[in-house]
A protein has these predicted regions:
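Gly/Pro-rich turn-and-neighbor structural signature
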Residues: 2-31, 36-42, 158-160, 169, ...
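Glycine-rich, often proline-containing surface loops adjacent to acidic residues and nearby aromatics
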Residues: 65-71, 144-145, 229, 267-273
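Active-site cavity-forming subdomains of large catalytic enzyme subunits
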Residues: 95, 117-256
């Protein structure tokens, strides 16, 4: 009835700009209007309810009405002191978590005075060479009360160990530490190239983190598997998602071989997605 009485008369006088509308990146066709009829007979299968399979409407029953998502800006200035000052300001402005950016030498395992680090020190994040550097980054910040995300992969075991040491120095039981370490070395090898060891020892270190956090830091996301970097490297949304899930399967296989049950560690596996305009 709407098409007959409203749409058709209007289009006869005011044609649409395009004969067909598609999403900007993946070219998915977008309909003119969507109604409950589009889900007729499959509402619970495709949409469902919050906190219930297939989780289209969220993994928690109340979602943001119960608790807002953590608000944190990916940030890291050249020196630890500058980064600490930035973090303190962000927290005073109402930010509810921290997201630490490392410079490329720190990501690839080079000290700041290494010849290969020349020109890159402190450029895309903070330079971390020692535990003292990391202590300066988090000076005056109680780790027990804040969630920290660290976008670090090849040197993730080192940076996470430093973070744990700071928590212990603050008198925090490490089981109460909360945050995320990216620890996704496969996407580094395939799409980004910030890796330092061959694949097998790199995977061993990644699973070392998964196992350690599972056993000692149950609130910490021990891996954040990402499709974003595949998109930036040229993959479309379908292939990027495929790479991401292929990586996830491989991490799970390696962790199962370590002797852990999937129910032990899977709840702290997180994902990082680049949705572009197709969301």
């Amino acid at each position: 009835e709407w098409e007959k009485n409203s749409l058709k008369p209007w289009i006869s006088k005011h044609p649409e700009r395009e004969s067909e509308f598609k999403t900007r990146t993946a070219g998915i066709k977008v309909g003119r209007l969507y109604t409950p009829l589009d889900l007729a007979g499959s509402y619970t299968d495709k949409l469902g309810f919050p906190g219930a399979f297939p989780y289209t409407r969220g993994i928690y029953a109340t979602m943001y009405r119960g608790r807002l998502w953590t608000i944190r800006q990916y940030a890291g200035y050249g020196t630890p002191r500058e980064t600490n000052q930035l973090f303190s300001k962000l927290l005073s402005w109402g930010q509810t978590g921290l997201s630490l950016a490392f410079d490329l030498p720190s990501q690839c395992g080079y000290d700041s005075d290494h010849t290969l680090a020349e020109g890159e020190v402190g450029r895309v994040g903070v330079a971390i060479n020692t535990l003292r550097d990391m202590e300066e980054v988090f000076a005056g910040i109680p780790l027990e009360k804040i969630s920290t995300s660290m976008t670090i992969n090849a040197t993730a075991p080192i940076m996470l160990a430093m973070y744990i040491a700071i928590g212990e120095k603050q008198g925090t039981n490490i089981s109460r530490l909360n945050g995320t370490v990216q620890n996704d070395i496969l996407k580094e090898v395939v799409a980004r190239n910030a890796w330092m060891l061959e694949l097998e020892p790199s995977m061993k270190l990644a699973v070392d983190i998964i196992e350690y956090c599972t056993r000692h830091m149950p609130n910490f996301n021990h891996i954040s598997i990402t499709d974003y970097h595949f998109r930036e490297a040229g993959a479309d949304s379908v292939r990027a998602a495929a790479f991401m899930f292929a990586d996830a399967i491989e991490y799970i296989r390696w962790t199962l071989k370590r002797g852990l049950s999937v129910d032990d560690f899977a709840s702290q596996v997180s994902f990082f997605l680049g949705s572009y305009m197709d969301i």
